[in-house]
Amino acid sequence: MAFAQLTWREGRRDMATCLNAKAEGLYHLGFREPVAKSTLADANEQRDWRLWEDLAKNLMRKARTFYAGEDLGLELENTVYALDSTTIDLSLTLFPWADFRRTKAGIKMHTQIDLRGPIPTCIYISNARQHDVRWLDELIFEPGAFYVLDRGYMDFKRLNGIACAGAFFVTRAKDNLRFSRQRSLPTDFPAGVRSDQIGKPTLAKARAAFPALLRKVRYFDAETERDLVFLTNPLEIPALTVALIYRLRWRIELFFRWIKGHLRIKHYYGTSPNAVKTQIWIAMTGYLMVAIIPVSYTHLTLPTNREV
């Protein structure tokens, strides 16, 4: 399946034909006889997708060790994560179990990536109808880490969960946010920082959901000529750093584009939930191997003449 992902095979027949064209090498891959289309179909349906999930998680841990020292261009040593999701459309006729509209089917891939890399650290696959913010209830937040979220995750109760775990968040504020300022911090107009305020949500329900102080930063992005309003809970870091942290969120968008552009997660070799999840997790192992192999060679210690 990894071979099929990386070489864009069109189906199980195409996969079997290509593998059998190199029959002399199949033994080393664990095949004792030519590969049949039915063998691939049976494996796709019967082998639990969690096997590939565990393999991908092991590769995630390995990949992160190689990229841990990457410079994000911020004066921060904290780990910075970005959270987002992407919807993968499916045929309602072939995948009726994934229906989410009257005429459409699809699944949603909720993803958390370490922006150093970027390397995925957590992936959850759900029906496309599930709202993004519900995924936050499943996560264990790392104390001291930053979590970069778009407006779809702006829920004060969930944001309070991040803060109570000792972690930090940076998110876009919704247009209808009502915020009561308690004090203002210095601005930096040349850098784009228009305002920097500390306060609390105005509405009683929102204030009860997030009782601690919040920080609201208004930033003008000269590249897009847009005013952006951020909410965050660290009160000490520079306001410009808050904006730069959020700007790094584009890396998760690039991650999704790379996955959809280079791996097969739109065309599936099976139609069951197990087959779809198997293919997605094997696609993740392919991405992680591509991330690991180049940097692993730079970490090799070559033997000295005496050792040779």
What is the meaning of each model-derived region?
Residues 242-270:
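Short amphipathic alpha-helical "interface-anchor" segments enriched in bulky aromatics
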Residues 298-304:
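Conserved small/polar residues in nucleotide/adenosyl-binding loops
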